[in-house]
């Protein structure tokens, strides 16, 4: 199978993912998953979720580049990108990924600040007298 490309997004983070058939190597920003995320086990599981769900953790290689956002948002963007790449790799995986919500882009982003307010919704202190 040829290389499959997909992008995943979450908040301001973007993950560009290339998926090829191989032996289960993950290369994220030139590092392995353990080097990239260190001791964040819950976030590592989040990244591996689509691979474990489709039982492809030992049969595909993933090369990814992440931009913007923090570690958690980048990891969720990576999960979204891997899910989209697996869907393009084999359409049969869609039935496993779609019910878990892994192909859906999480559209929640930071609410903008409004004028006359201190933050998006926080008002200045009100004094009656």
From Swiss-Prot:
Keywords: Ribonucleoprotein, Ribosomal protein. The keyword Phosphoprotein does not apply. Pfam families: Ribosomal_S9. InterPro entries: Ribosomal_Su5_D2-typ_SF, Ribosomal_uS9, Ribosomal_uS9_bac/plastid, Ribosomal_uS9_CS, Ribsml_uS5_D2-typ_fold_subgr. GO terms for biological process: translation. The keyword Ribosomal protein applies. NCBIfam families: PRK00132.1 (NF001099). Belongs to the universal ribosomal protein uS9 family. This is Small ribosomal subunit protein uS9. The lineage of its organism: Bacteria, Pseudomonadati, Campylobacterota, Epsilonproteobacteria, Campylobacterales.
